Amino acid sequence: MAEREVEIVIPPHAPGLQHHFADLEQQREASTMGMWVFLITEVMFFGGMFFAYLVYRRMYYQAWVAGSEAMDFWYGTVNTVILICSSLTMALAVRASQLGRRRALVILLIVTMIFGLGFMTVKGVEYHGHWLKHEFPGPSFHFEGPYEQQVQIFFSLYWAMTGFHTLHVLIGIIIIGFVAYFGWRGDYTPANHNTVENVGLYWHFVDTVWIYLYPLLYLISHSHPFK
C-alpha cells in the first residue's frame, strides 16, 4: 500500500516579521521589553550622576548657587521648550504610524529631528560661551568669585551630565533619520509599527532627563530650599 504524501502548508511570512519570532505580537512584546530593559540601564547611568550632583550640592550649596548663576537661564529655558515640542511631534509620529499615515509619520519625524538639531545648536552656543570664559574643568579653569575649587566640581558635573545628554540627543536624531527613511519606504504599517514606538520611548526618555537637568542646573540660584 503506497504511503500518502502529506502536504505541509507554510503560513505566509508577515511583512516585517523576523525569522526567530512566531508572529508580530511576539516580536512586539520582545522588542518592547528589550527597550524597557535598555532604558532601565540608562536610568541607572544618569542616576549615578544625579546622585553625585545632589551629594556635592548638599556639601557645597553656596558654590552650587554661584555655579548656577553662571548658567544662561534663557538658553536652558529655550532648550526646554524645544524638547517639550519635540516630545509632542514624536508622540504624534507614533500615532501616525499606528494609523498607517505614512506621509504624516515622515513629516513629524523630520520635524522632531529639526527640534533635536535646534537643541544641539543652542547647546553648542552655550558650550562655546563657557569655553571662552574658561569654565571648563582643568588647569585653565577660571571662575570670577568665591568657591572657585568647589564651583569647578559643579562645572565638572555640568559638562558630564549635559555632555552625555547631548550625545544621547545626537544618537536619537540619527536613529530618527533612519526611521523616517524606512517610514517613507513604507516599512511600517498599523500591524507593524513597534520600531517607531520604541524610538519614541527613547526620545521621551532623553527629554525627561533634560526636564530634571533644567531645574538642577539653571534654577538652583532662583530657589534655595536647602539653605
Protein language model regions, located:
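...captures the hydrophobic TM-helix bundle architecture rather than a specific catalytic motif
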Residues: M1-K227
